[in-house]
Amino acid sequence: MFRPFRSEVEHAVESALQTLALPTDDLGVETPPEDVPATLASSVAFRLARSAKDSPPRVADDIAAAIDLEPDSQTYEYIDHVDTRGPYINFHVNDAYYMDTLTAAQDPGYGHLPNTGQSVVVEHTSANPTGPVHVGRGRNTIFGDAVARLLEYNGDTVDRHYYLNDAGRQVGVFTWAYEKFDADSLPDPERDRPDYDLVRYYRRGNEFLENADADAVESAEDEIASIINGLEAGNTETYERVQTVVDQVIDGMQHSFDRLSAIFDEFIKETRFIQNGDADAVVERLKSADCAVYEDDAWQIDLSAYDIEKNLVFLRSDGTTLYTTRDLAHHEWKFDNYDASVTILGEDHKLQAEQLDATLQILGNDTDQLRQPFYSWVNLPEGGMSTRKGTGVDLDDLLDEAIARAREEVHDRLGSRVRDDSLSSDDIDRIARQVGVGAVRYDIVSKQPTKGITFEWDRALDFEAQSAPYIQYVHARCCGIETEVNSNTDLDIDALTSDSIPDITMLRTDAERALLQEIARFPAVVESAAADLEPHVIATFARSFAEQFNTFYRECSVLNAESEIMTAARVSLVRAARHTVANALDIVGVEAPQSM
């Protein structure tokens, strides 16, 4: 209800300013200062004081007096009253606001906004198919998946794509190495999975190219070039050789994505835009551009008009295209098929992103359709990570460690559980997985993406602090309360519908009203976070929501309330809270356990 309430406040302020013949270009509607017990406030009096030739508090009083809240106006459904404190005009909500919030949040889908009619493609991860997913690249997956989930909650129709580089040098090296080396000459794979099996060939190939004698390296490079040129020429046999490697690796990597509950709707292969001629068509169009130059034996685009010093090379001297050339064709395909495109990129790709955007404009595209948020890297306490030589930390290793540590924590807490149900070994395994994977996802997505992260176990798995387990425990606690009410009272809470929940006047305490305020804010938080592509805002909301729920839990007994109707009212509030926290967790890709 916060969103319609905010609209009412904006209308009220604008109408009052019009009545007073004051400018309405900036209404100043915002969250009030902490010491002001209002839901929204307007600081517009600050801006207008000089033009009104009066002090901000007096201007605020005049504006507040001009707001018409008479019952017969029937303009405002949720504004109860307006007052001022200093220069702030403060807006307070009525009981209908709380009642409609409680009613709306009985829906398990609470927080989903109406359909926007907009189609969006979110491209993320897109790691080269050369081996297992690395921890650093895992941030792309976690951040990108959360952005896609957030946009779906915002009402967009979202497709998740993985752009597969199956045409570059690394794939050429991989294919050559796979065909050259015998499995018996390689170390045992670290896991029984295709990506771990095949990465051995890639690592051995790179070792060979670095350490073999010059003649052997030259011969190998000729074979690698033949593979790359064969792909560029659309040679079917070469394509099939490459796909034998690529498809196996992607199949293995998919297991890591599945562990994170990160879903891809489609893997878009780079060779698609070679084979269908789109990349060649882009080359011909770029050659005819006024800013096209032929320098250093390559066709380039001079981007100085876009304040980009480095030219974009789009065609090599041997007639082969580059990754960005093919990506230009890829993006034009996305523009043709979707209303908007989001590409999640590492911060080391900022120059390429700028070059891509500028060149797309040169090709006549509206790049307002394209957003390219960046993320920084993830480090473990012992330092940075790398993949090419196999010296980095794989995402699977991090998830295994998280689950193992979570299992230890669950075992340690068994004796202090409040609920009298028993946990089987399968329950403990489930909770350990939910908590361990959730800890990794939440700890990564809760940070602003452009800030580097050093992953710390004690923080990520802290059940008592501001972490995923702390928030997950709130959901489990809600489930436990509902189960206890069903088991120990005559109430059938499953029969409580949005039409039969008790009157909101039952819920009068500060803790109850504060929790309802947080529930009411959730859809607006989704809307704001989606507009800025900032899932960390949802993570922050979930954390503060958990704190507010725990205050309610400490101060307001549900099972031992003074009457059955009060129990019914409070359990309705608990269910509304459960739906809110479950969906906040869902947006950031964290499971909501029913027990812990």
Swiss-Prot record:
It catalyses: tRNA(Arg) + L-arginine + ATP = L-arginyl-tRNA(Arg) + AMP + diphosphate. GO terms for biological process: arginyl-tRNA aminoacylation. The keyword Ribonucleoprotein does not apply. It is found in: Cytoplasm. InterPro entries: Arg-tRNA-ligase, Arg-tRNA-synth_N, Arg-tRNA-synth_N_sf, ArgRS_core, DALR_anticod-bd, Rossmann-like_a/b/a_fold, tRNAsynth_Ia_anticodon-bd. One of its GO terms (cellular component) is cytoplasm. NCBIfam families: argS. Belongs to the class-I aminoacyl-tRNA synthetase family. PANTHER family: ARGININE--TRNA LIGASE, CYTOPLASMIC, ARGINYL-TRNA SYNTHETASE. This is Arginine--tRNA ligase.
